[in-house]
């Protein structure tokens, strides 16, 4: 429900920005350390008290639900935190903006000491964090990996073709 409310609000906001011919920001970054989203989104929509009250009437605590959400660790430091703050600032100032990145299967790694040695483990953030993602399979494109390029000139027309590549849909 919360994601649906946010999606509808974003659609209305972008429609208005386009109607006013406002410029839009598209921010591409490899890392976004957004933190946990549920608390932030409830607060920004002004719904935290209402949801807390509704849950309380069912014998549940909102704080316990907050603690179930994994931290979307999609980066490991300054760059990811800066990107998140930048987007948060743009949203707060009501600029039409969208952040783009790769959807990592694993976030930043977790560390654990085993027999006195540091061991890195994958951060499985998707099982509880994918609720905020919105798939758009109709926008998928073919991405080529490996292979080689063949360059051709046909008069004044130049073309490059990728040969023997591994193709994936992304």
At which residue positions do the language-model features occur?
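A conserved ligand/cofactor-binding region detector
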Residues: 1-170
